[in-house]
Amino acid sequence: QDGDKDLYVVSAGYDLPKNSPLLQDRLYINNGNGKFSKSTNLLPTMKSSGKSVISGDYDGDGDLDLFIGGNVLPGNYPLPSKSYLLKNENGIFLDVTNTSPNLSNIGMISEAIFTDYDNDNDLDLMMVGEWMKPTIFNNNQGVFNEITMNGLENTEGWWFSIKAADYDGDGD
């Protein structure tokens, strides 16, 4: 909350053993002068292979929370590794994935975004990945529920990026 840009490093590896300590993500805190220090106690233990990390204030409390999209389970392509939803509580990130259990093993996430797709003034979660369809999770007071959108049926594939924009210029 000091305004300095910190650095989150997601870990991944196909050849690493399951639960390897090398799969633990890292958070480096910027001291304001361009020097980063590795934090040792701000992230929960997460020893899985990830790919996409996004930040957004999904719970509306004024700080940035995180979603970490899991990718491949080491040594077991195309099985997905776990994804995580981390709530920022006074600078410490707590694993609250179990509040939205469908997020945990949704697929091999390539990219995710927080966006208010339904214009209800909270951040929803959209994601794409390998061997999956574009997926939307509606934010209902901090709990993410998967929804089905008309037009996204039968769209499974190898998706690698997603962008949110008002393409028709109508304000939504």
Regions found by a protein language model. Give the residues of each.
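Beta-propeller blade termini
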Residues: 1, 42, 50-60, 64, ...
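A generic tandem-repeat structural signature
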Residues: 1-32, 36
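Hydrophobic beta-strand positions in blades of beta-propellers and related beta-sheet-rich domains
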Residues: 7, 25-27, 66, 83-85, ...
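Hydrophobic beta-strand segments that make up the repeating blades of beta-propeller
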Residues: 7-11, 66-70, 124-129, 172
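Flexible loop residues that form catalytic
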Residues: 12-13, 58, 71-72, 117, ...
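Short, solvent-exposed loop/turn segments at conserved positions within beta-propeller repeat blades
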Residues: 17-23, 75-81, 130-132
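Blade-edge motifs of beta-propeller repeat domains
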Residues: 28-48, 86-107, 138-157
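Repeat-solenoid scaffold signature
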Residues: 128, 132, 141, 153-172
